[in-house]
């Protein structure tokens, strides 16, 4: 049985004061025991959040990590070993904003994925299509290619210690949301692609949906058989809203 997971991606939001307030709100939440809860603050605030959530069953992750496992001469980057030392357990790899705006390629993301795993940092691989790709009927082709990039480089068993988040780019921060059935169809295809390589890995990997998930639509999305939780953007910046989404996953 796959454990539900709700992960909050804070993106490039926060000041010391607002992060302290949000962290306090999260620490006061009554979270369902059966749900794995994680937050991904900006790198500058990782230590502050870890300290603020001490004793709380909330995992802290990073939004990005370097292409090499160890510290070294790579200006502006943070190495997986440094993130692990700080207390991170997870890292987002390939979020659409990094693919689309920063220009990260599958090759770069493969290196980041491997570097993270080499230091015991669990990757959350983000995959998804743009509106143009969906309208052209290329959703499964695009998602399949992004998934295959990792499988071809490292084998499907790389996903035995990873999470996959499907995030249709057109639904991120737009207020648009894939219908539960649209999301389920893609999640089923992802699990099917993995199962063609290794049924055991496919059955165990957590598949999250990301794309304007809110308390109002979370229960319906999470009720789908291949949706194991959510990667939450804007709604994760409100502790009460995030708590409601976590409870929806617990139900």
From Swiss-Prot:
PANTHER family: TRIOSEPHOSPHATE ISOMERASE
Pathway: Carbohydrate biosynthesis; gluconeogenesis; Carbohydrate degradation; glycolysis; D-glyceraldehyde 3-phosphate from glycerone phosphate: step 1/1
One of the GO BP terms on file: gluconeogenesis
Active site (catalytic residues): 95, 167
Record function comment: Involved in the gluconeogenesis. Catalyzes stereospecifically the conversion of dihydroxyacetone phosphate (DHAP) to D-glyceraldehyde-3-phosphate (G3P).
Superkingdom of the source species: Bacteria
Taxon lineage: Bacteria, Pseudomonadati, Pseudomonadota, Gammaproteobacteria, Pseudomonadales
Enzyme class: isomerase
Name under which the protein is recorded: Triosephosphate isomerase
HAMAP family xrefs: TIM_B
Keywords, in A-Z order: Cytoplasm, Gluconeogenesis, Glycolysis, Isomerase
One cellular component term from this protein's GO annotations in UniProt: cytosol
Entry binding sites for substrate: 9-11, 173, 212, 233-234
């Amino acid at each position: 049985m796959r454990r539900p997971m709700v992960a909050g991606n804070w993106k490039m939001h926060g000041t010391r004061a607002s992060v302290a307030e949000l962290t306090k709100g999260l620490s006061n939440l009554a979270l369902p025991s059966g749900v794995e809860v994680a937050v991904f603050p900006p790198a500058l605030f990782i230590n502050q959040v870890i300290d603020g959530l001490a004793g709380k069953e909330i995992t802290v992750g990073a939004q990005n990590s370097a292409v090499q496992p160890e510290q070294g001469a790579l200006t502006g980057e943070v190495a997986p070993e440094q993130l692990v030392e700080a207390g991170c357990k997870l890292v987002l790899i390939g979020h659409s904003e990094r693919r689309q705006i920063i220009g990260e390629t599958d090759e770069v993301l493969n290196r980041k994925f491997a570097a993270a795993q080499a230091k015991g940092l669990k990757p959350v691989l983000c995959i998804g299509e743009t509106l143009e790709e969906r309208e052209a009927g290329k959703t499964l082709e695009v998602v399949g290619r992004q998934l295959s990039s990792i499988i071809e480089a490292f084998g499907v068993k790389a996903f035995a210690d990873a999470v996959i988040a499907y995030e249709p780019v057109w639904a991120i921060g737009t207020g648009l949301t894939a219908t539960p059935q649209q999301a389920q169809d893609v999640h089923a295809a992802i699990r099917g692609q993995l199962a063609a390589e290794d049924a055991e890995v496919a059955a165990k990997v957590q598949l999250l949906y990301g794309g304007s998930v809110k308390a109002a639509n979370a229960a319906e999305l999470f009720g789908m058989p291949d949706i194991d939780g959510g990667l939450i953007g804007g709604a994760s910046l409100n502790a009460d809203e995030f708590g409601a989404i976590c409870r929806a996953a617990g139900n």
